């Protein structure tokens, strides 16, 4: 455990995670300074007396005077003043690094462009089914430092590429990179290779590495070694059989896919990697398999919002990048027409990989938001451009017949028109109930 007494600590970024960092240092006899680029940062009113707070910008004087900077994942390390601090030898970490220095129980760590929240919560539920005391958090649910406040036999962390950039002591018992597809290119000017390098940091000092056999970008930099176990829908140590009817481990059939509560090939892949992670930390196999038969998935992840008159309305608002939308469309079989809602802030992504999924005459595109016009160019002859998602849905509703599906899987972030992807999903569900 690290000793911070006497150190000048600056925390960048408030909110729940920033406050958890403040609590962490106060409990160790250190009064940190806090700054946030927002003029009215959330949680400012909850700061303890004596904690100085600078808001509206980064305070370069404070940063250059610090011994330790704890940076929010939302602030790029490439920011000039942070580069200057790093060049001056000032230590820069994130809350996950603080957590890892203190944690004594094994850690399961999960990253990837898509599916990480589902896999993280699924492994957590598998541990609970075995009556383990488990802490689940990180990029989902509770800030990691909050998990230190209760006794745990296991920690399960969802980690973003941004969080991994400032983490050095993870030493996970089991670590997985689910997939790597283009995302956050606004933060990674060198492209996918820079983004991938951040993701692969999760494998550093891991005892077991879970690798996607169908995505070479998830391979550790040094290649496969004895620490590695693979998963994949079509190949791997953990895979589906040729008929997609069973989950198999080392060619032994374990569970029929029709017994799994989650649906879709991408969710079967999530089940496989969760099982591999659970096996790696010794969760009894029967508890893991039982969990797969009852786990319903998370809100806004390919979630059935409404089924009426033979029409399915699917809320996949969490599909905030191209890879996630590709996963939703992969293997989708419909009797009728797919009405696909795309749009929002594309984060400088290349949308062209979606094209192969938009073939045929049984799909209609409805594109909205900041990058709607660019998305409509994927297949202009079947695309309708609207300003908002609501306008698109009101146009779609009268056209629907039994067998059709309305799928919100936008391939974009929501912040151009919504508070977050959850609000976008709730709005879709409200409109589905009103018009469907």
UniProtKB/Swiss-Prot annotation:
Residues that, per the record, bind ATP: 112-118
| Described purpose of this protein according to its UniProt entry | Cell wall formation. Catalyzes the addition of glutamate to the nucleotide precursor UDP-N-acetylmuramoyl-L-alanine (UMA).
Record-linked Pfam families: Mur_ligase_C, Mur_ligase_M, MurD-like_N
The Swiss-Prot or TrEMBL record describes its family as follows: Belongs to the MurCDEF family.
What's a single GO MF annotation on this record? UDP-N-acetylmuramoylalanine-D-glutamate ligase activity
The keyword Cell cycle is assigned to this record:
yes
Q: Which gene encodes it?
A: murD
Please give the HAMAP family that the UniProt record associates with this protein.
Answer: MurD
- Pathway terms, separated by semicolons: Cell wall biogenesis; peptidoglycan biosynthesis
Q: Which GO terms describe its biological process?
A: cell division; cell wall organization; peptidoglycan biosynthetic process; regulation of cell shape
Q: What is this protein called?
A: UDP-N-acetylmuramoylalanine--D-glutamate ligase
Q: Which NCBIfam families match?
A: murD
Q: What is its EC number?
A: 6.3.2.9
Q: What class of enzyme is it?
A: ligase
Q: Which reaction does it catalyse?
A: UDP-N-acetyl-alpha-D-muramoyl-L-alanine + D-glutamate + ATP = UDP-N-acetyl-alpha-D-muramoyl-L-alanyl-D-glutamate + ADP + phosphate + H(+)
- Membrane-crossing segments per the record: none
From the broadest rank down, the organism's phylogenetic lineage runs:
Bacteria, Pseudomonadati, Pseudomonadota, Gammaproteobacteria, Enterobacterales
| Alphabetical keyword list | ATP-binding, Cell cycle, Cell division, Cell shape, Cell wall biogenesis/degradation, Cytoplasm, Ligase, Nucleotide-binding, Peptidoglycan synthesis
CC per GO annotation: cytoplasm
Localization recorded for this chain is: Cytoplasm
**Which organism is the protein's source?**
Photorhabdus laumondii subsp. laumondii (strain DSM 15139 / CIP 105565 / TT01) (Photorhabdus luminescens subsp. laumondii)
